[in-house]
Structure formats: C-alpha cells, structure tokens
C-alpha cells in the first residue's frame, strides 16, 4: 500500500512538472510596465437610451448605466448619458445603446454619418431590433442585413458557445458559459450568412427547445457578432434585471467596450 502511494505521488509530481513545462511563464521584468492614466481621460463614451421602452428593457438599461458608470471610477474615461443623440458625435469614441436605436430621421442620419466616419458602437438586445416596419435599410445592413425573426419566452438562462478563441472580445472567456435569464432574438437571414459578419458567441444547441410560451425549436442562433465594415459589436443580451449577475458575462461586456474603443481611428487610448 505504501509503495502504491509513493508511486501515485511520483506520478502526480511528474504530471505537474510536465504541465509547468508546457506553460510559458514570462518574468514581470520582461513585460511592459503598467500604464497609469493619471489625470488623462483615455476616452469619451455616450450611453444613448430611451425612457419610453418596456419595463424589462428599462430594468436592463438602469443596471447598464450603473455598470458602465462604475467603470469610470478613477476618472479613466468620461461617460455621458442622454435620451437624445447629440448633434455632434465626433467627441465620442463609442456610443453605447442598451435599449433602443435612433427613431427619428435626424438622429438616424446623425448616427449613420458617425458610424460611416469611424465611430464606435456597442449595442445590446433591443437596440438591434428591427422588422419590416422599421423603415431604416442602412441600419439593417449595419447589423448584417438581418431583421427580427422570433424569440424565446419567458426569459431564461442560455448556454453559450464561444466561436473565437483569438478575438480580443472572447479570448479570455471560457469555451462555454451560462448567460443569465434573458429574451434572445433569432434573426433572418442568419447573420452568419453575411461574409462581413464575424460571430463570436452563439446559443448552444443543447438549449432547444427553448421557451414555454414562445418556443424556439432550433437553428443557428448567433448572440454576439461584429460587422467588419464598421467599428461595432452587437450583444443579444439585455432583457430584465439579471443580465449583470454573472461575472463571465460582465467580462464579455467590458471586453466589448474595450475592443471597440481600442480600434478608434484616433488611436488606441489604452496604449498611451
């Protein structure tokens, strides 16, 4: 018995040693020193939202505003919050839309011009909603040529699959995670069919059938994607008051913000 224990211990030590050799440890002396912003504001962001949306979307927006405000602790960046889209969007490195996209012609034209001139966008859930009555062809193309098809109901957690281990938004996330309860939109045509779209996260097939009242039975179900023609990312999460209860999903949100800002034509503010 004693010999067996010694053999087992020896095997474990060998395994740990092999794992240590496989991992590449880099000395702190060989890594670029930390960058402190000091009095410098690295970038400026705008949260554009509506107070005229359904309760579950108001709940998400209220929490989203609090979440992103906490990220400004230490004055690392400036965050403005408004229900109107400013006439001049050029000062903003990113516009965050938690619950709605512009609805009137003036704001739509303003946002389109901003994005076509290198602006940044982080959109959640209902901010991407569009159907046959929306009447904004550019925005539909901006999202990948898609419109709303269906959704699960009631809101429920969803098992997510990562589709990229190299993209900055997902490279430090687990291969799978459970997204807190939400209503998830499925789209037509499939965003993946557009060569300009890069899908980063999708709903795992094990979720189906999904829903009790409104049931989604299957099919490809992208959740997070980017349009390579713009500096943007769309995240399907954003319904109710549970979306910020998961650390992995919160990291996804931070990564999304950081990535969009880091690709600014003004230069990467995190590299200063």
Segments from the language model and where they lie:
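Helical hinge/lid and interdomain linker segments adjacent to catalytic or ligand-binding clefts
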Residues: 46-131
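Positively charged n-region of N-terminal signal peptides that target proteins for export
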Residues: 1-5
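Bacterial N-terminal signal peptides
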Residues: 7-15
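Catalytic beta-strand/loop cores that center a nucleophilic Ser/Cys/Thr
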Residues: 24-30, 36, 152-229, 233-234
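Sec/Tat signal peptide C-region and signal peptidase I cleavage site
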Residues: 16-20
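A glycine-rich, often tryptophan-bearing local segment used as a flexible ligand/cofactor-contacting loop or short
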Residues: 101-175
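Extracellular ligand-binding/catalytic regions of CAZymes and related secreted enzymes
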Residues: 21-42, 67-70, 206-223, 227-272
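Short, solvent-exposed loop/turn segments at secondary-structure junctions
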Residues: 52-53, 86, 102, 128-129, ...
């Amino acid at each position: 018995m004693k010999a067996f224990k010694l053999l087992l211990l020896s095997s474990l030590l060998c395994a740990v040693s092999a794992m240590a050799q496989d991992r590449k440890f880099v000395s702190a002396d060989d890594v670029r020193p930390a960058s402190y912003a000091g009095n410098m504001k690295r970038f400026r962001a705008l949260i554009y939202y509506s107070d005229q949306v359904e309760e579950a979307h108001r709940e998400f927006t209220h929490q989203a505003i609090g979440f992103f405000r906490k990220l400004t602790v230490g004055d690392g960046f400036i965050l403005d919050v408004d229900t109107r889209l400013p006439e001049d969007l050029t000062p903003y490195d990113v516009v965050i839309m938690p619950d709605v996209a512009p609805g009137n012609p003036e704001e739509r034209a303003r946002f389109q011009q901003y994005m076509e001139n290198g602006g940044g966008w982080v959109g959640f859930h209902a901010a991407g909603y569009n159907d046959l009555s929306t009447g904004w062809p550019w925005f539909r193309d901006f999202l990948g040529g898609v419109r709303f098809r269906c959704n699960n109901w009631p809101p429920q957690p969803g098992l997510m699959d990562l589709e990229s281990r190299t993209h900055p938004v997902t490279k430090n996330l687990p291969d799978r995670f459970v997204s807190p309860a939400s209503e998830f939109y499925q789209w037509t045509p499939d965003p993946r069919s557009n060569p300009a779209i890069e899908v980063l996260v999708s709903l795992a097939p094990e979720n189906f059938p999904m829903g009790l009242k409104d049931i989604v039975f299957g099919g490809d179900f992208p959740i997070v994607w980017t349009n390579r023609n713009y500096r943007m990312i769309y995240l399907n999460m954003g319904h109710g008051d549970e979306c910020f209860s998961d650390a992995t999903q919160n990291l996804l949100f931070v990564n999304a913000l950081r990535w969009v800002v880091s690709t600014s034509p003004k230069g990467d503010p995190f590299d200063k």
